[in-house]
Design a protein with these regions (language model features):
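Catalytic pocket-lining loop regions of alpha/beta-barrel enzymes
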Residues: 105-109, 120-228
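Generic structural signal for well-ordered alpha-helices
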Residues: 31-38, 64-71, 96-97, 128, ...
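Short beta-strand segments
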Residues: 45-50, 83, 177-179, 203-205, ...
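Active-site gating/metal-coordination segments in enzymes
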Residues: 44-45, 53-150, 196, 200
Length: 271
């Protein structure tokens, strides 16, 4: 992500307790360095999450151009996620179209950092409706942050998973991904939505792998709609390798592990 855009308070939280911060900066500055890390870890492809939240985090719409350029280093391996925040661009729907043209594969909404409820289009926000409409037309999944955020100024009420219920209903051809599975307060809501809606998925990034079955004891039931992720280098996520190893040690079927680690992402983001 473009760390140079981050507000000092947000950047301080990203740095806190992270001994490898210099390495993180190096990976962000040079995609070849990051690809070398993926090779070392045995990771075939990675989704790089970016979004627009100028007031709380500092990310402006220019983050889309930054990540599109970054991922051009290896578009077969680096999956670009960009963002739209109505009011920061003249036409939110047109911005989604532009994102698709420059190689961005998915849209990320962060309700608690954007102070924007996922279903706000039902209350007159036509620009948000345009985001969903154009993403659906362009075949771009929309990832929506669910659950809490500890960043200064985050408005967590907007990130309740059930607010995404309307989105799944009103845009039935849109792939919706609930980021973080509602962690840590709303995981039952996320599980319910993934089971209810054909077009609803979730990722498990930002959740300690050893706690996954405590939070989602019936995770194997939805294994075909769960995406593995780490949320690295976010707060509380020290490394990628340990996350993978702990996930692989879970007492679930190998078939379920493969779906979560590989098959589901390969299906949603074909090369």
């Amino acid at each position: 992500m473009p760390y140079h855009m981050m507000k000092p308070s947000a950047l301080e939280l990203m740095k806190r307790g992270r001994k490898d911060y210099a390495d993180v900066e190096r990976y962000c500055a040079n995609p070849k360095e990051f690809l070398g890390l993926l090779d070392h870890l045995g990771v075939e492809r990675a989704g790089l999450i970016n979004y627009v939240a100028p007031k709380i985090i500092g990310f402006t719409p220019e983050a889309n151009d930054w990540i599109a350029k970054y991922c051009k280093a290896a578009p077969d391996r680096l999956i670009a996620f960009g963002g739209v925040l109505p009011g920061t661009v003249p036409d939110a729907g047109a911005e989604v179209d532009r994102m698709a043209r420059i190689g961005i594969r998915a849209v990320k909404l962060h309700p608690s950092h954007q102070v924007l409820s996922p279903n706000e289009y039902m209350h007159g926000n036509r620009e948000l409706a345009a985001v969903y409409e154009r993403a659906q037309t362009n075949g771009m999944p929309v990832m929506i942050h669910t659950g809490t955020s500890i960043f200064p100024g985050a408005r967590n009420l907007h990130a309740q998973p059930l607010l995404c219920d309307d989105v799944a209903i009103d845009y039935p051809e849109l792939v919706v991904i609930l980021a973080h599975g509602g962690r840590p307060l709303c995981m039952e809501e996320a599980f319910f939505l993934v089971r209810r809606h054909k077009n609803m998925h979730m990722d498990i990034s930002g959740i300690p792998p050893q706690k996954l079955l405590e939070y989602f004891p019936r995770m194997e039931e939805i294994a075909g709609k769960v995406l593995w992720g780490t949320d690295w280098p976010g707060p509380g996520v020290p490394e990628i390798k340990g996350n993978i190893e702990k996930f692989l040690s879970l007492p679930i079927r190998d078939e379920a592990k493969r779906k979560i680690l590989y098959d589901n992402a390969a299906r949603l983001f074909p090369r």
